[in-house]
Amino acid sequence: YLKEVVTLSAEQETLLQGIIDRLLQGEPLQYIEGKAPFCGMSFIVNPSVLIPRPETAELVDWIISDNTTQQPHILDLGTGSGCISISLSKQMPQATVEACDISEGALEVAKANNRENCTSVTFFHHDILDLTTPLPHSYDILVSNPPYIMQSEATDMELHVTEWEPHTALFVPDNDALRFYRAIAEIGQTEVLKPGGHIYVEINQALGKETAELFESYGYKEVTLRKDIFGNDRMIKCYK
């Protein structure tokens, strides 16, 4: 069946052409629209933050399924858009959730998402790699989706990712690819992670074994490596 032909106004034509031009330049549709879906919610996104991925939603689901009756105090390290922390706060109203990031631009986006989704996450500025600056509380759960893509892997990635999404949230040097996981493991060894507390992280699929061994080397127990929906090593859980 033929649908009714719609005639666009000059203003609408200009707007549509602008969108087409941005798409042709490789800009992600989520940045053009200014929003992206995640865990049944809508999140504001712009080039200050990564676009949420379905694999990360699996990490959120893992935490929720493990903590249905507890009232955990959670810290999201490197929150970006706030998609992890806000989703946990929304689906675990009994939890106290905090989140940090080194990027002020990312924190602005995360705080806006906190308001839009009517959650009560506390956000603050912090550099995960700065082990000298204390964190504000002790937590039951540390969660993170830190930068983990090696610089050498960039050539195999789509241009809409490498040209538009923030490199500081994506890439790590090949010669120190696990730097953020090492920092998280060291943070967890302090009073920041309570005895018996858990760490959940998203990881590089090419470094699953190495990342698991890193947490084991720090004395964490029951280090569990889990695959994502695509069959790739993607998440690790362990406890103190």
Which residues does each PLM region occupy?
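Conserved AdoMet
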Residues: 1-65
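Active-site beta-alpha loop architecture of Rossmann-like, nucleotide-cofactor-dependent enzymes
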Residues: 30, 149-152, 206
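Short loop/edge segments at beta-strand edges and connector loops
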Residues: 33, 125-126, 227
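Conserved beta-strand segments of alpha/beta enzyme cores
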Residues: 42, 96, 120-122, 221-224
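Conserved SAM/SAH cofactor-binding pocket of Class I
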Residues: 55-156, 183
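C-terminal beta-strand of the catalytic ATP-binding
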Residues: 148, 239-240
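Mobile active-site "lid"/loop adjacent to the S-adenosyl-L-methionine
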Residues: 148-180
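Conserved Class I SAM-dependent methyltransferase catalytic core
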Residues: 174-238
